[in-house]
Design a protein with these regions (language model features):
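Bacterial N-terminal signal peptides
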Residues: 11-19
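Bacterial N-terminal signal peptides that target proteins for export
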Residues: 2-9
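Glycan-processing catalytic domains of CAZymes
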Residues: 22-333
Length: 333
């Protein structure tokens, strides 16, 4: 998950005791393969509904490596299904120490580089999001990410709730027809600081980013096709891409699909609460009941994104597979 998923992975994904949700028990599931299959199914479905619709995955860098039971076949399928991938905290972490941003340790940075190398080699656009709080950190982040062939963004706002004050990295007026052309991007997932829906949209329209990643909703209502279309033009000219957020590995209590009775009587696909992120629950993403919430009907999340005219979907919590792998290993240990 943006703003904290890396923290959970780094902590080893310890069992969250005493949390609401069904207990995690070992099932006969190939967790990496199940996640890759879900992503491939989402790709096939979206391509049929809207040719050219793109998918960016977040948190799934480990699936580009043959490890933890992941196969070369899975890697190849994932590279074909994704139009881009994002990794957070390659150089600067989301966590702070003594109120200051901190550099990612060298071992983790090197792991990210190794995991992302197959994507870079295959020509898959790699978005890197670092969290910083000083100009020299931002400059260092942009330099290091650019050297690796990543599309960089150094965010000063961990909450991803405001527009950056600086101009976009490598600002340009060119039309963006594909993610492979993107040179800069911005993520804004929490619009609560904007005074109104129109103020929020107007602020986004006034930017020059090649790619915007935003939430499908403002308040209880999704953005309309007209509103999304108005975001596709950069302030100083040129077509840009606009993607909508969708979590594939966690359910969120503030989403339209959430039912109150699930808190006391959780469905079979709901797993442990994410205590690092209030209102989020891990999901057994391979279960058809959860996948029906994601896609396949007019009320499904992906279908709403497509209906609103977005260019693609930003799939968060792809690393949910590792959560279940870790729990299974802990039970066997």
């Amino acid at each position: 998950m943006l703003m904290g998923k890396w923290k959970i992975l780094a902590a080893g994904l310890a069992l969250l005791l005493g949390a609401s949700g069904t207990a995690v028990r070992a099932e006969s599931v190939d967790y990496p393969q199940a996640m890759v299959k879900l992503i491939c199914d989402l790709k096939a479905y979206s391509a049929e509904k809207k040719p050219g619709f793109g998918l960016i995955g977040n948190g799934g860098a480990g699936l580009f490596l043959e490890q933890d039971g992941n196969t070369g076949e899975n890697v190849g399928r994932l590279l074909q299904a994704f139009d881009g991938t994002m990794t957070e905290s390659v150089n600067y972490r989301w966590e702070v120490e003594q109120g200051r941003a901190v550099r990612t340790n060298e071992a983790d940075t090197e792991y990210f580089h190794q995991a992302l190398a197959p994507a870079v080699t295959a020509g898959l656009p790699v978005l890197s999001l670092d969290y910083v709080d000083a100009k020299d950190m931002a400059e260092d982040s942009y330099q290091k990410n650019q050297e690796k062939g990543y599309i960089p963004w150094a965010s000063f706002r961990r909450e991803l709730d405001a527009l950056p004050q600086d101009k976009p990295f490598k600002r340009n007026d060119r039309d963006m027809a594909a993610l492979s052309q993107v040179q800069n991007y911005m993520v804004l997932l929490n619009p609560s600081k904007f005074g109104s829906r129109e103020a929020y949209l107007e602020a986004l329209r006034g930017t020059d980013y090649d790619l915007l990643i935003v939430d499908l909703f403002y308040g209880p209502e999704p953005l309309t096709a007209g509103e999304v279309a108005s975001l596709k033009q950069k302030a100083h000219g040129g077509r840009r891409l606009v993607y909508a957020y969708m979590s594939v590995g966690e359910a969120e209590t503030y989403r339209y699909y959430w039912q109150r009775e699930w808190q006391d009587n959780p469905p079979c696909w709901l797993a442990e609460a994410n205590t690092d992120w209030q209102g989020s629950f891990k999901v057994k993403y391979w279960r058809p009941e959860w996948q029906q919430i994601l896609y396949g009907s007019p009320e499904a999340y992906l279908d709403k994104i497509i209906s609103s005219g977005f260019d693609g979907a930003f799939l968060d919590v792809v690393d949910a597979y590792y959560y279940f792998l870790s729990h299974e290993a802990g039970e066997q240990g």
